[in-house]
UniProtKB/Swiss-Prot annotation:
<dbReference type="InterPro" id="IPR034678">
    <property type="entry name" value="RNApol_RpoC1"/>
</dbReference>
<feature type="binding site">
    <location>
        <position position="71"/>
    </location>
    <ligand>
        <name>Zn(2+)</name>
    </ligand>
</feature>
<dbReference type="InterPro" id="IPR006592">
    <property type="entry name" value="RNA_pol_N"/>
</dbReference>
<comment type="function">
    <text>DNA-dependent RNA polymerase catalyzes the transcription of DNA into RNA using the four ribonucleoside triphosphates as substrates.</text>
</comment>
<keyword id="KW-0240">DNA-directed RNA polymerase</keyword>
<dbReference type="Pfam" id="PF04997">
    <property type="entry name" value="RNA_pol_Rpb1_1"/>
</dbReference>
<feature type="binding site">
    <location>
        <position position="491"/>
    </location>
    <ligand>
        <name>Mg(2+)</name>
    </ligand>
</feature>
<keyword id="KW-0150">Chloroplast</keyword>
<dbReference type="GO" id="GO:0000428">
    <property type="term" value="C:DNA-directed RNA polymerase complex"/>
</dbReference>
<keyword id="KW-0934">Plastid</keyword>
<dbReference type="GO" id="GO:0005739">
    <property type="term" value="C:mitochondrion"/>
</dbReference>
<dbReference type="InterPro" id="IPR042102">
    <property type="entry name" value="RNA_pol_Rpb1_3_sf"/>
</dbReference>
<keyword id="KW-0862">Zinc</keyword>
<dbReference type="InterPro" id="IPR000722">
    <property type="entry name" value="RNA_pol_asu"/>
</dbReference>
<keyword id="KW-0808">Transferase</keyword>
<keyword id="KW-0548">Nucleotidyltransferase</keyword>
<dbReference type="GO" id="GO:0003899">
    <property type="term" value="F:DNA-directed RNA polymerase activity"/>
</dbReference>
Amino acid sequence: MIDRYKHQQLRIGSVSPQQISAWATKILPNGEIVGEVTKPYTFHYKTNKPEKDGLFCERIFGPIKSGICACGNYRVIGDEKEDPKFCEQCGVEFVDSRIRRYQMGYIKLACPVTHVWYLKRLPSYIANLLDKPLKELEGLVYCDFSFARPITKKPTFLRLRGLFEYEIQSWKYSIPLFFTTQGFDTFRNREISTGAGAIREQLADLDLRIIIENSLVEWEELGEEGHTGNEWEDRKVGRRKDFLVRRVELAKHFIRTNIEPEWMVLCLLPVLPPELRPIIQIDGGKLMSSDINELYRRVIYRNNTLTDLLTTSRSTPVELVMCQEKLVQEAVDTLLDNGIRGQPMRDGHNKVYKSFSDVIEGKEGRFRETLLGKRVDYSGRSVIVVGPSLSLHRCGLPREIAIELFQTFVIRGLIRQHLASNIGVAKSQIREKEPIVWEILQEVMQGHPVLLNRAPTLHRLGIQAFQPVLVAGRAICLHPLVCKGFNADFDGDQMAVHVPLSLEAQVEARLLMFSHMNLLSPAIGDPISVPTQDMLIGLYVLTSGNPRGICVNRYNPCNRINYQNKKRSDNSHYKYTKEPFFSNSYDAIGAYRQKRINLDSPLWLRWRLDQRVIASRETPIEVHYESLGTFYEIYGHYLIVRSLKKQILFIYIRTTVGHIALYREIEEAIQGFSRAYSYGT
């Protein structure tokens, strides 16, 4: 069993047959070696006990019940005085039943079998190392054709057949008879190679360092040739150079990890521990079995048949042996990756069997569901909505979620303040949602950040820390500026919330993970907190000066008459000076709150003289004179009030309440940053 305190990482790769045997083989106290699964059976239909040497054998994988052997005898586990440590009658050790979760077995294959991941997955590692087409290797693995072994300076039967086949026609009838004689096995093993054994021999003969040297030389030669002018030839050369680079990298990986290429062909097939492929009894006495058990049974049946053909029947036709080897290869392929070669294998109900690949890959696989993405305590999940009134470092947490996440902290607060005598009373107060509970919850949440995570977490900005705030409803409120880091929007996205418990986790959340500490992309340094979606629409509406709004089109036939009537009315009554004048922005916003003006209504706002920017060459649109001698020069976006001596008395700019509100927000933000900078220096 893996000790979580001693092992910090897990490496997945190819292993040698010796390593597989070491994992699965164990020596009993009487010296007997067990570990090989030879029978395709699971449980006996009468006794309901595991079959000996089967897929659930207690001798191989350990007892089903701790300290109880297959005979029913009991021994105390860990007692040094208990002797013997195993049952001499059934051969089952008196150990903890948890051994069945990690004790492996193995199947000794009657013929080598290629691992389908290394053959069929793209890129094909076997095809890359051997520098041969994948279709050719597939035909060899599945016994569609054979190749002759290179035997130099020796006459071979294949050469003789090639010489005499066309000279002596009678040999055409005598040669096939030779392939069915008893001596053909010796000839076949000497001169003919097919199946995964042929692949294994070629991989074993490879020298990885020579492959690297030859590939580099060929790559340099192709680079020296340059462009030929033929687009098709240039693409062919480019693909060849890319292939050579992949081949060199693959060979270097094998050398660096001390992996032999022939390990990609299996001689021993590991058998998973029984607890990882269980058989469960459901209501009514029916049994539910993992699909992997059925696939293992299929492999054992075919492997035993091939063993019988090779050992007992010496006169078996070679075509039958090759066909059975192909069936064993296909059975192992289905066990490892069902459907990788085409149509997947199905059961009697036309349901596809779940192979080993299906068990470990994907969102519901062993890694993502039970190891990486498993459910944890002190976490929740809900839909996110926009929180326009939130600060950048805050998030709105629904009361229902908050009271569950911080329940233990609230209980401790109630007991410390003597508002509850024990845990039971505190839980009762929480269930009844007494007002004091929400006060304690507010105190607890003030100094405790939470972590928000949106799957998939592709980079560090996928999980950030926030200061929680209680909100009504059942949705998590989020500031729209942090959406880009999460790659989130408000169309139904869900986010998970976690509570950091340890002091180290809380310090890390405050110093490194708070949203206002992650304003720039860690990858390229660009701003990550930029307005998007709702904020862009809001800024457009806020600064839009069109009195007709952004959704009305005056060129629409339905709106043309209304627009013409409004234009005619404006020409008769509308004057620039009829628009309201305000001496400061506070008066303008106050008038808007009193509903005397609209958000996009044009108005005149007095501007400070030291901040004016006036184009000297611009001519006024209109000039209005008053009886006292003062006059107004009206331009496109501003108005100047001059005295009788043409001195500037006031300057008014033409704006809207939306522009004023945006300007004040920017001004306050800049002033706040300046104060913070001055305090820091």
